[in-house]
Structures are given as structure tokens and as C-alpha cells.
Amino acid sequence: MRTYRYFLLLFWVGQPYPTFSNPLSKRTSGFPAKRRALELSANSRNELSRSKRSWMWNQFFLLEEYTGSDYQYVGKLHSDQDRGDGSLKYILSGDGAGDLFIINENTGDIQATKRLDREEKPVYILRAQAINRRTGRPVEPESEFIIKIHDINDNEPIFTKDVYTATVPEMADVGTFVVQVTATDADDPTYGNSAKVVYSILQGQPYFSVESETGIIKTALLNMDRENREQYQVVIQAKDMGGQMGGLSGTTTVNITLTDVNDNPPRFPQSTYQFKTPESSPPGTPIGRIKASDADVGENAEIEYSITDGEGHDMFDVITDQETQEGIITVKKLLDFEKKRVYTLKVEASNPHIEPRFLYLGPFKDSATVRIVVDDVDEPPVFSKPAYILQIREDAQINTTIGSVAAQDPDAARNPVKYSVDRHTDMDRIFNIDSGNGSIFTSKLLDRETLLWHNITVIATEINNPKQSSRVPLYIKVLDVNDNAPEFAEFYETFVCEKAKADQLIQTLHAVDKDDPYSGHQFSFSLAPEAASGSNFTIQDNKDNTAGILTRKNGYNRHEMSTYLLPVVISDNDYPVQSSTGTVTVRVCACDHHGNMQSCHAEALIHPTGLSTGALVAILLCIVILLVTVVLFAALRRQRKKEPLIISKEDIRDNIVSYNDEGGGEEDTQAFDIGTLRNPKPWRQQSRRDMVPEALFLPRRTPTARDNTDVRDFISQRLRKMNTDPTAPPYDSLATYAYEGTGSVADSLSSLESVTTDGDQDYGYLSDWGPRFKKLADMYGGMDSDKDS
């Protein structure tokens, strides 16, 4: 039997215009009384203001996820204007109209064609209208209604994360918060219990628990130890329908990690350690490493090491390696195998970060014994002192013993030692040492005034092992002996006025002494015995290492005696007494009435070497003569250099002089024999012959020729002078030129005869020599034309 479902109008809408009513009900004949009751109820609501009712509907309800084979019936639309004759047509529009929802245009029945999901769309809004089939006009105004999708429990709870990660400190109290999980249900929370979620724990008990309503996970077991187990995996279930049977559920995984707390003290894996080190290990040398283990991690596993007890706590130290958390035993002081061979230490390891709530577990530290054995090493000799200071008088003779040094082998073998002086510190070999007993003695004489301190180095070397040696500085002080006489501090030269009075101070004397007596210097001054009697001056000793020169008479005559030389004896008071004689020069000068010097023997003051005026004049005269001689010699040499190269026009050598160029002349080729000029032979006729140069040279840059008029005048002047010179050589000489021959555009040059020997010579061939000899051809061609005329 097909069942029809009628949806009743929830409330009537009263309007001044005709209203709609919806007599929707189940299409089952079993509920006529209920429908009449609803219609009556609707009629009674509008007794006071009765108006025409057109539609009797407002909203419909439809269950989601319908699985039937037929269309799902939604409801029926009906208008009061519908008389059942088929004259009205129902039209549906809005959300899903024609697709999800269809309407029977004759009866107004609405059906859903597809399965609907409330989670996708919970409400559909549609519009209904009834029109006249014949006229096509609406008989009622268009009205809007909704279709609500009723929820069913078709969605399981879903957690916000697939996997949760959380941490909680180990040893935490029961009920300590760990993490909160959250699940959501897409069903309608306002309709039944479809969206009411309850949490429960499926895996992770008895360590953790979860609150059913909030999803908060807490610790459920006391004293969970990270060192025993660090990771926990908890599975939480979320179930809807309030956890009742038939509800849907979802699960999630929570990975919980226990974080470390300092609940474990450090522990040494062994109680005793033993190391060895040579006695030569310098301070800071690592000997060995010890390590205590701590089950904690991070800063809770940090360990500090310290030496708390033992006979070697002042000889060794322990430092902590922050990376490896190891204790490094190091040498603190120099070791000596001969003094102590074994040391015992007590080393403690402790945690710097301690949590007071775990002190009940015991002290967070541990200790171990460290035994250190010192190995013997062959050591160099050791001097009895770090440095030696000796003294010796400067008048000590050679081979005088100054003192001694001592060194011995610190090893048990006590190897013998020999001594030597480092000659780099005693280059002059002033001192020497006995290699057997270390006695220091002199090998040269000493002088305190030359060098007060001598700093040398003594070397002690083991005889059996020369590689083992030690050095010690030796400072030798040379003690003073009075072996130097006092002398004037400076050269004294003073003056006295001609009108000086007796007992007048003219100069104060000072003395110095290279010696350095223990009681200080004490000098005495006096005139030399040979000058003490009849002296014109006296010496006054001031008893403070100074003395004054006083005049002994009234007035002095510089014309009679212009200079006085006073020998002064200076003595010291040391033993043996040393003395010296110094000379003070006193000049007699003319002074004004104030005692200021006006004139003395100026030549003596200016020329202290004693040269007279005559000697100076002679020296100046010699210098003048020497300068004149040099000037004359230079002038003669210059005049010789200016002798002409072309002596006369008749010179049959006929040298060609090239200006503004170098090379190619007789001065360069040395063709001219100067010996023939000095010893001329009788002249004889010589035939002229042309020479072809043997060597070829690269062409040179042709210099700019002088003006033709200047060259012609110069040659003419030289020719006239040579023609009148009786000493001109009447012969030709062979001239070899550096630039001529096959490399030249012109042919070879022959000697040009002078006008006195070959006056009738034809120079026309010069025109055939080319453009380079055009100037020469013009010159000699002009001469021929002058002869003809």
C-alpha cells in the first residue's frame, strides 16, 4: 500500500490580500479527523478578520539519504481557486526546481528525484505559483516556501589532526596535563545525539587517561621513568550518539614523549684509574681522561670534575671537556722523578643542575681514585743558582780566578758534567772556565772605564750525553782601581784686562776623572812647581773640586807680554794618588772701564794654528799663480783644437767638410798622417787615383745643407788663406771615406786639386754625379766660367 505524507501548515499568515493555506497531510485515509481539526483551528484563528485563503502551506520536511527506488514524496500544493477541473497549472521554481524537485502541474504534488545530504545543503528555498491554463495568468501571487532536510546520523566524528604529538616530564604526578584532542561531527547538533561526541582511550592504559567530554589526556601512572621507556603511543576514540550503541566513531593516535629530568646521579664505571707521565711534562700537559656516565640527557647529563683529596692535588688539575663530558687530568706543576714517583688523587664527578625534589634519591655525585706514575727522564744538568754575580778588580792579572759555578745531573745516575763559556757572549775571550770544576778566570786584562759589566753565559753539559745541557747567565762586575789621573773638564783659554787689579778672579777651573772611587772624587789644584815662583797669577783651590785663577799684580802690558801659559797640577785623593798637569792660556786684552774686552791679538785668536800675516799672503799668492797657470793651459788647449781642417785651397787632398753631421772625414778615418806635417819630405809629383770603399754602411740621414752663399764664402776664404801659406804640404794623401762607393748614388770622389797645381782642370764632370753634388758643381762650374770670361 502506497503511503502519502501530508505536511501540515505550522502557522497561518494573515494578510489584507488573499492568503494561502496548505492542507498538507499524509495521503493516507486514516487521518481525516486530524486534518479537520487543523483546518478548524486555522478557521478559528481568523474569525475576527476573515479573508480569502489561497495557499495552505509554508514549509516542508524531508529526510536525508533516502535509499528507496521511487521518488521521495515531499508534499502537495493546493489553491482554493482549484476546482478540480484541470483549469489551473502549478509551477515550481527556486533551489533545485526541475532537477532535485519536481511538481505535478495538475495536482501540485512535489517529489524529490535524488538522494539529498543535509551536510551539503540543509535548506532549499523554492517559489510556487498557480496560473490559469487558458489565459496563462496567475490566479494567485507567487509565494515562497522552504524544504528542510532532516538529519540522520550518517557522519562519524573526525579529529582535527591525524596524529598528535605531545611531551610530558618523566616522573610527573598523576593527573598531569599532556594534550587535548578534539573531534568534530558534521551531523546536526540540534537534532538528537547525532553530533554528541564522547572520548575514550583504546590504547595507552594504564599510563594515560582521557576525559570523555573534553578530550584532555592526562598521566595516570606514577613515576614513569624516561630511562626505562621514553615513547608512548596512545589511541583515542571519539564516538557520537553520546557513546551509545549504534553511534559512529573515529580514532586518532597521540605520540607522547617523556622529557628528561635530572633524576640520575653521575656514576664512574670503575673506582680506580691509573696513568703515566714523564717527569719532563710541562704544566698543562694532559695525562689521561676519565668519564662518569649519567643516564640523563642534555644539561641534566652535564658533569663537573674536581680533585677533592689526595697527595697530588697541588701537582695536578682536572678540567671538564664540555663536548665529551670527560675529565682531563693535566700537570699543574713541574714533576721530579727523584723527589716523588707516584701520586694518588681523588676525583669527584657531580651534576651542576640538581632538582631538589629528587634529592631523596641520594647525592648527585660520585668519586674515583686516580693513580699517577711519574716516569724518569734523562734531564739536563741543573745549576745551583739561577744566575751568578761575580766581582773582580780591574787591575787583576791574567789567569786570576774570579769565582766558580756549580751544576750537577739531577738524575739518579749522577752523570759527570763539564763546563764551557758560550763564546757568542764573550767574543773577545776575556774570560775562561775550568771545564772540570767550573772556576772562572781572566784571560785578558780588564779596564773598568772601557766596560763595567761583562755578561756571559756558562754551559754545563753531561759528558755521557752531550745533548743534555743547561745554561746560566754570569754577570761579572769590574771593580774600580785609581788608574786614571784627573784632568780639565774642558780646554781653558781666558783673558785678563791690562788694568786688572790684584786678586781678581779671571777663570774658574773644573776637573773630571774616569775613575769612580767609592767615597767620591776629591780634587786639588795648584800651580806647577816650575811656575809657582814669580808667576803673575795664583791658583785658589775651592775644596769643592773647582779652583779659581786670580791675578797676582795690578796691571798688565799686552805689548810686553800678550799671552801667559799657566801649568796647573790636578791631583786626586785616592790610592795611589794620580795627578796630571793642564795648561791654561791667559791673554792680555784692552778693556773698557766696565771691564769688557775691546781688543786682543786678533790674529792669535782667529788663527790659533799660529800662521803669520806673511804666511797667509804667501799662501794666497800661490793660489793665484796656480789658477792663472790652469787658465792659460786651458786656453792653449782650446786654441789647438780650433786649427782648421782644410789648410789651403792648393791642398791636393781636397777634404770635403760636412757640417751638421758626424763621421766620414779624415778625423774619423784617421787618413791624415800628422807625422808628415812634423817631418815634411821633399815634394814629388804624385798621380791621383780613385779608391772604392771596401765596407758598406747603412745610409745616414742627410743633414740640412747650409745656405749656398755661406758655404761658398767659407771655402773661398779658406782657399785664399791656404794659397798664401808656405807651410802647406805640396802632396796628396790617401783619404778613405766611410760613406761612398757602391752604396752611394754618386761615384767615388777623387782629390780636388788646388787652383795653383791644376788650374786648367775641367770640373764639368761634377754635373754628372747627381743631385747630391749639384751645389759643388755650381760652385766650380762658376769658377770655370769666370776664367773663360
UniProtKB/Swiss-Prot annotation:
Residues 19-53 form a propeptide. Residues 269-279 have a biased composition (Polar residues). Keywords: Calcium, Cell adhesion, Cell membrane, Cleavage on pair of basic residues, Glycoprotein, Membrane, Metal-binding, Phosphoprotein, Repeat, Signal, Transmembrane, Transmembrane helix. CDD domains: Cadherin_repeat. It is a single-pass type I membrane protein. Highly expressed in kidney and brain. Glycans are attached at residues 255, 399, 437, 455, 536. Residues 54-615 are extracellular. Residues 637-789 are cytoplasmic. Gene3D superfamilies: Cadherins, TCF3-CBD (Catenin binding domain). It is found in: Cell membrane. Coiled coil: none annotated. Residues 259-288 are annotated as: Disordered. Residues 54-159, 160-268, 269-383, 384-486, 487-608 form the Cadherin domain. InterPro entries: Cadherin, Cadherin-like_dom, Cadherin-like_sf, Cadherin_CS, Cadherin_Y-type_LIR, Catenin-bd_sf. One of its GO terms (biological process) is Notch signaling pathway. Three calcium ions are usually bound at the interface of each cadherin domain and rigidify the connections, imparting a strong curvature to the full-length ectodomain. Cadherins are calcium-dependent cell adhesion proteins. They preferentially interact with themselves in a homophilic manner in connecting cells; cadherins may thus contribute to the sorting of heterogeneous cell types. This is Cadherin-6. It comes from Rattus norvegicus (Rat).
